Amino acid sequence: MSKFVIYQVLPRLFGNYNSTNKHNGTLEENGCGKLNSFTAKALSEIKSLGVTHIWYTGIIEHATQTDYTSYGIAKDHPAIVKGKAGSAYAIKDYYDIDPDLAENVETRMKEFEDLVKRTHKAKLKVIIDFVPNHVAREYHSDASPTGVADLGGNDHSNWAFSPLNNFYYLPNEAFTPKMDVQGYVEFPAKVTGNDCFNASPTQNDWYETVKLNYGVNYMEGHQKQFNPIPDTWIKMRDILLFWASKDIDGFRCDMAEMVPVEFWGWAISQVKAKYPDIIFIAEVYNPSEYRNYICNGKFDYLYDKVGMYEMLRNVTSRNFPVREITNSWQSLGGIENQMLNFLENHDEQRIGSGFFSGNGMYAEPAMIVAATLTQAPVMIYSGQELGEQGMDSEGFSGLDGRTTIFDYWGVNSIQSWANGGKFDGKGLSLEHKELRVFYQKLLNITITEKAITEGLMYDLEFANFDNPKFNTHEQYAYFRKYNNELLLFVLNFDDKCLDTEVCFPLEAFQYLEIKEGQNYQVTNLLDETEKFPLLTLSTKHAFITYMAPWKGLILKLKRV
């Protein structure tokens, strides 16, 4: 697949123009975005950023403290729901749309199907979550197809483990978390979602969820009982097929490593047999298992959180020297094009937060690396392009530098850009308008320049270790090349203005098949008004340039 750009967005937040923002506020007080908020205009503006895919986060019905019993939806016990809105990752019904997101609750599935059609009409693709490891404690599907048994519906709850069961149980023990359960009763206790095999999870556990049983007996040395195929495998495959039939284009699979790789290889193969173009992205954090989840699990792409994200964050925060970026991509050993790069998502702290850089513009060079160093896809999180700081204390989600996934809230930067549905950016500051322009230029370059989407990469960092006019603690440089198209990237992670010189080794000319000594016209794709003299590419001539703080150059070299 050609390089693509994902825009992650929580519909709950995106279309909410209510600015009340009462701490721990209800739906009625703080409001909630809707699927219908993604109008043709909204989608057009998102696409104009250079986006190719939208990951609609929190689409599937999850536990909530909002009462929908008048629509035939069972009420959730508030003691086991995180936040008034509830976590998008505590799924309550795998076969339904979250009612919060519908203008008409009774037609919520049609509103989702219409959203998919609008998104495709805007020439964008649709990704949704698949949350396979855990469900809400009071999971019950009231929307499953006729004849589909509920998860846990046929379980033997007096058995701690059986491959026939969908959950794990703690026989003869009541659920007694280390918090006030306000009368909630669960007996026997089910095992909590983060592999907490005791009846008393803490506030730091995923106490609002229960773990699904894929036939691994954790209490007997992780014994695998996969023959015959466990019941959970069949039910979860059918859920994937259900959503694939809604014409979506991909799944982002939550905490994929907490589910056996054997299931993924089995299920993904069956889904792709019927829907060959659908993509699967795995949230993974164990580099030693990456190849296993690609080769045996059949995933198309994996999160590169532990490697490139952590590296770019530390480089931007000036904890690591910039030259360590080289070690990061080299450590992947050939699978770097199958990683998903990002600097923000719903789990991570905002770049502009006081916990990261304090200003979204400081991550411009890091974002250039994430987007252009390899052929891998790249993702941004709604509001990232607007400098969102994530420094609100919304309710269950405290002041932690993240935008809440638990509470009803209005995100100031998104509201300022959306301007009540006009999506004209009228309420943005000049600085944040400029930041959005940067993202728009960068991401469009990322998907249109063949040197980036299909080309070779040559890292120039090692060739400049001993260059006194290039600081490998603060600067980074590399080539991308496809046929006769050549790009030179020079990035400054320093907070100071400086002049720098980039040297070119003989190996670069050999690897990229560039003839030494040729002259090139230089154009900065991020600012085409900037003037450069002719560049002679040679081992004897360095490229000399001025660099502004926290900025990067994407230079297109045209032979003359």
Label each region the model flagged.
Residues M1-S2, L10, A90-I91, D100-K117, ...:
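Alpha-amylase-like alpha-glycosidases and glucanotransferases acting on alpha-linked glucans and related
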Residues S2, Y17, N21, T26, ...:
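Loop/helix patches that line or flank the sugar-binding groove of alpha-linked glycan CAZymes
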Residues L13-N18, I46-I54, G58, A63, ...:
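A generic secondary-structure signal for well-formed alpha-helical elements
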Residues G15-N18, H62-Y68, H134-S141, V259-F263, ...:
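Short catalytic/ligand-binding loop motif for oxyanion handling, primarily in non-cytosolic enzymes
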Residues D495-V560:
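C-terminal beta-sandwich/jelly-roll accessory domains of carbohydrate-active enzymes
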